[in-house]
């Protein structure tokens, strides 16, 4: 696995959770002898929703909601077998979505 790279993409709605998970991944990879690029913060996706508060009339009464999706990207360069095993056993927070690709 010395000539391959691992690309890890983290997605979450809470920036504190995603930053803690990114730190855990970086520490685990460095402890097993691999080098890491990142975490690189990608642009935050903001979805805005406007909802009428009144069920019948009063068009002027509205509530606005926003859903932010935070994304971090990391590259693990020249991972060893120990690195892959440690990353597979790593237990991250429940609100973080992890996507792993081998290059």
Curated annotation (Swiss-Prot):
Cross-referenced SUPFAM superfamilies: Ribosomal protein S10
Record-level GO cellular component terms: ribonucleoprotein complex; ribosome
GO BP term, example: translation
InterPro entries, A to Z: Ribosomal_uS10, Ribosomal_uS10_CS, Ribosomal_uS10_dom, Ribosomal_uS10_dom_sf
Pfam families for the chain: Ribosomal_S10
GO molecular function annotations of the record: structural constituent of ribosome; tRNA binding
Extent of the signal sequence: none
Domain of life assignment: Bacteria
Keywords: Ribonucleoprotein, Ribosomal protein
Quaternary structure (record): Part of the 30S ribosomal subunit.
Family stated for the protein in its record: Belongs to the universal ribosomal protein uS10 family.
Function according to Swiss-Prot or TrEMBL: Involved in the binding of tRNA to the ribosomes.
UniProt-recorded name of the protein: Small ribosomal subunit protein uS10
Record organism: Vesicomyosocius okutanii subsp. Calyptogena okutanii (strain HA)
